[in-house]
Amino acid sequence: MARDLVMFRDVAIDFSQEEWECLNSYQRNLYRDVILENYSNLVSLAGCSISKPDVITLLEQGKEPWMVMRDEKRRWTLDLESRYDTKKLFQEKDIYEMNLSQWKVMERIKSCGLEGQESPHEVCFRQVTKTTSGKTPTYRKLTSLPLYQKSHNREKPYECGECGKAFRVRQQLTFHQRIHTGEKPYECKECGKAFRQCAHLSRHQRIHTSDKLYECKKCGKIFTCGSDLRVHQRIHIGEKPYECKECGKGFRVRGQLNLHQRIHTGEKPYECKECGKAFRQYAHLTRHQRLNIAEKCYECKECGQAFLCSTGLRIHHKLHTGEKPYECKECGKAFRVRQQLTLHQRIHTGEKPYDCKECGKTFSRGYHLTLHQRIHTGEKPYECKECQKFFRRYSELISHQGIHIGEKPYECKECGKAFRLFSQLTQHQSIHFGEKPYKCKECEKTFRLLSQLTQHQSIHTGEKPHDCKECGKAFRLHSSLIQHQRIHSGEKPYKCKECKKAFRQHSHLTYHQRIHNVT
């Protein structure tokens, strides 16, 4: 059976600069994915090397595709009789051609610019009309041909058999299914890292080529995509434009809001086929499945602890070997992980790129800002199932739970003292070593713990960030505020076993107990 030749331009979509600037990052990524995937398919079908179109070269380099628009003087004749399968999109000086199957993608990308309502059984040729305002181009109808109704009524006919998620374009379903299969056909020749989509590989390769990288001026973090940098910068300015209508909580990224809303709806679309347990996020399902499959875990031969990835095991193994390859040039302190060194160096530089919008307090880590903001919001997301007490930090919950079980698995080899948390053991061991790595720049006093230095520095600054909501009195330390609040609440948690007298502070109880010891 004879076959018609397929040219790359038959499965391509072209944009002018004006059109390209009207697309958001999601629409641009969709365009890149479709074009790169189509080119990949043509190469595989050809079975031999073919010349690479300029637009593919630009997309692989992360550049804008409109840079290869056809010659302005070149015009093609619209001939529906001889080219019935092809639609043509005219602009004043440029003419672009696309295949019928790709028209549906174009329809989706440009749907925000439609004027009026067409028949649901028609797909229209439209002419782009340039606008002086720079907004999304408008369109006027030239002619029409029958097409599926789904292009207009926004149906999603392509459904994933694994999780039920539906898509308007078959190509999107193909990309999505690779999440379930784990297929990552696009591999970086420089570092071996693999990706599900060709566009993701192209963006990654900019790291190696140093082509058009975007650096955050606040913290120095590097991004290969401008949109990723813009999203990241919201961490520093505290911007959270996506708000949940149910509880008012804000998010930096729309995807985070979508995941959060499942808490209110109770939706758990990802189900484990082994045990039937369902999850709100696919990442949670993946983690659950890997925990259930022993052969996929990475186990430490020294202590038997298992990890979900080999990287985690390698970092953990340094605990046993004592290896700390990343050393601070200022104080000589060494770290197992480079990221720990980067964060540590901010102690010396004084860099605190994360600002609280409520009180202006700055932090060296984004996570510390997140925890701090819970003081203002009152959020305590971690609940103890034993006593229903809530905590702002997960570490506080874990530490608290040790009270119920009485377990203290981390023992100091120097003195035999045991602790519930490994971090507590690490802090304690600095007593034996005499190590005090945290120095106050004002008075040169040194401290074992960063928290001690932070508390001390408030003496110099006069800062009292902890306010009593009852009387407005402010305190340097949160513990001082807790003690003060007992005046208003009348709480006296420290009771003398001899005479049953109760006290607000433990020091008061200790002082009182001397009476009984004397007698």
Swiss-Prot record:
**Would the keyword Metal-binding turn up in this protein's UniProt record?**
yes
- InterPro entries the UniProt entry points to: KRAB (IPR001909), KRAB_dom_sf (IPR036051), Znf_C2H2_sf (IPR036236), Znf_C2H2_type (IPR013087)
Instruction: Give all residue intervals belonging to the KRAB domain.
Output: 6-78
Gene Ontology terms: cellular component: nucleus
What Pfam families does the record point to? Answer: KRAB, zf-C2H2
Keyword Transcription regulation on this protein?
Answer: yes
Provide the protein's localization. Answer: Nucleus
Please report which protein family the annotation says this sequence is part of. Belongs to the krueppel C2H2-type zinc-finger protein family.
The name under which this protein is listed is Zinc finger protein 30 homolog
- The organism encoding this protein is Macaca fascicularis
